[in-house]
């Protein structure tokens, strides 16, 4: 599989071939993904919740994102690597936003993702001007859950719906190469997808986007809580628990280690 680029994303929009994205936060997971046909790996700030144990993503730092991006990049996957810009790494001013985006690229990402709508237009333009591809993110933006009044579906009112449409158009104009739409009503995501020339990526926004993204812990059945819009394709939590319990039993009953697991000195 050859390296996926942002041009491939745009092409898939025109050919109506769905784009597939999963999060990954470490080398072994990225190595497994590298042997699949997945289009893109998102090193998401969701690592704060599913890896570091925080209640939300607000405590994730640039140091965290750089470290995990490096780990994923060391697997040398052909998938497009997109790294999230964490909370307060791009909102303060465009100069620091460009610098932090550059640090993620130096860590191995092929593009960055940031949250927000039209208010991020100048920031997106500055990062793109610096030569760094940007993926946008609208709808439920987890870094802004306090302002949104919690984790909820966005677009219930006409005002919210109109703002989502405006945000998507402004971000496209600013130069994003694709747009994540999270936890909005399905008809809104469909409208946005039809209006934009860039690909849209849904998470909890229905089937009409140009692609889908999931947190890999949800897909593998590892999460403590799985959102209604996610699907678990396997229950690894149960498989891992069973393996650990079997190991305990084997050790206590002298069934591990067996002869093939150690060496004896020849007499």
Curated annotation (Swiss-Prot):
<protein>
    <recommendedName>
        <fullName>3-methyl-2-oxobutanoate hydroxymethyltransferase</fullName>
        <ecNumber>2.1.2.11</ecNumber>
    </recommendedName>
</protein>
<feature type="binding site">
    <location>
        <begin position="45"/>
        <end position="46"/>
    </location>
    <ligand>
        <name>3-methyl-2-oxobutanoate</name>
    </ligand>
</feature>
<keyword id="KW-0808">Transferase</keyword>
<feature type="binding site">
    <location>
        <position position="113"/>
    </location>
    <ligand>
        <name>3-methyl-2-oxobutanoate</name>
    </ligand>
</feature>
<dbReference type="GO" id="GO:0015937">
    <property type="term" value="P:coenzyme A biosynthetic process"/>
</dbReference>
<dbReference type="InterPro" id="IPR003700">
    <property type="entry name" value="Pantoate_hydroxy_MeTrfase"/>
</dbReference>
<feature type="binding site">
    <location>
        <position position="115"/>
    </location>
    <ligand>
        <name>Mg(2+)</name>
    </ligand>
</feature>
<comment type="subunit">
    <text>Homodecamer; pentamer of dimers.</text>
</comment>
<keyword id="KW-0460">Magnesium</keyword>
<keyword id="KW-0479">Metal-binding</keyword>
<comment type="pathway">
    <text>Cofactor biosynthesis; coenzyme A biosynthesis.</text>
</comment>
<dbReference type="GO" id="GO:0005737">
    <property type="term" value="C:cytoplasm"/>
</dbReference>
<dbReference type="InterPro" id="IPR015813">
    <property type="entry name" value="Pyrv/PenolPyrv_kinase-like_dom"/>
</dbReference>
<keyword id="KW-0963">Cytoplasm</keyword>
<feature type="binding site">
    <location>
        <position position="45"/>
    </location>
    <ligand>
        <name>Mg(2+)</name>
    </ligand>
</feature>
<comment type="function">
    <text>Catalyzes the reversible reaction in which hydroxymethyl group from 5,10-methylenetetrahydrofolate is transferred onto alpha-ketoisovalerate to form ketopantoate.</text>
</comment>
<dbReference type="InterPro" id="IPR040442">
    <property type="entry name" value="Pyrv_kinase-like_dom_sf"/>
</dbReference>
<keyword id="KW-0173">Coenzyme A biosynthesis</keyword>
<dbReference type="GO" id="GO:0015940">
    <property type="term" value="P:pantothenate biosynthetic process"/>
</dbReference>
<dbReference type="GO" id="GO:0003864">
    <property type="term" value="F:3-methyl-2-oxobutanoate hydroxymethyltransferase activity"/>
</dbReference>
<feature type="binding site">
    <location>
        <position position="84"/>
    </location>
    <ligand>
        <name>Mg(2+)</name>
    </ligand>
</feature>
<dbReference type="GO" id="GO:0000287">
    <property type="term" value="F:magnesium ion binding"/>
</dbReference>
<feature type="binding site">
    <location>
        <position position="84"/>
    </location>
    <ligand>
        <name>3-methyl-2-oxobutanoate</name>
    </ligand>
</feature>
<comment type="similarity">
    <text>Belongs to the PanB family.</text>
</comment>
<feature type="active site" description="Proton acceptor">
    <location>
        <position position="182"/>
    </location>
</feature>
<dbReference type="Pfam" id="PF02548">
    <property type="entry name" value="Pantoate_transf"/>
</dbReference>
């Amino acid at each position: 599989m050859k390296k996926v680029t942002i041009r491939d994303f745009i092409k898939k929009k025109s050919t109506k071939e769905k784009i597939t994205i999963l999060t990954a936060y470490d080398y072994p997971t990225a190595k497994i993904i590298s042997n699949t046909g997945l289009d893109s790996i998102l090193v998401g700030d969701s690592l704060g919740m599913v890896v570091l144990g925080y209640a939300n993503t607000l405590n994730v730092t640039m140091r965290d994102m750089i470290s995990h991006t490096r780990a994923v990049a060391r697997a040398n996957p052909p998938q497009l690597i997109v790294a999230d810009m964490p909370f307060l790494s791009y909102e303060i001013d465009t100069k620091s936003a460009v610098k932090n985006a550059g640090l993620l690229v130096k860590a191995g990402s092929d593009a960055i993702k940031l949250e927000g709508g039209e208010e991020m237009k100048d920031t997106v333009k500055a990062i793109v001007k610096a030569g760094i591809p940007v993926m946008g993110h609208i709808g439920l933006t987890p870094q802004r859950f306090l302002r949104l009044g919690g984790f909820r579906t966005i677009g219930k009112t006409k005002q919210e719906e109109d703002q989502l449409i405006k945000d998507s158009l402004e971000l496209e104009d600013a130069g994003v190469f694709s747009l994540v739409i999270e936890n909005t009503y399905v008809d809104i995501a469909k409208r946005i997808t039809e209006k934009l020339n860039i690909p849209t990526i849904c998470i909890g926004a229905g089937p009409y986007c140009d692609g889908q993204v999931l947190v890999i812990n949800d897909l593998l059945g590892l999460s403590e809580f799985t959102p209604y819009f996610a699907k678990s394709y396997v229950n690894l939590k149960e498989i891992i628990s069973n393996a650990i319990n079997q190991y305990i039993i084997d050790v206590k009953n002298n069934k591990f280690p067996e002869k093939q697991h150690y060496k004896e000195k020849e007499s």
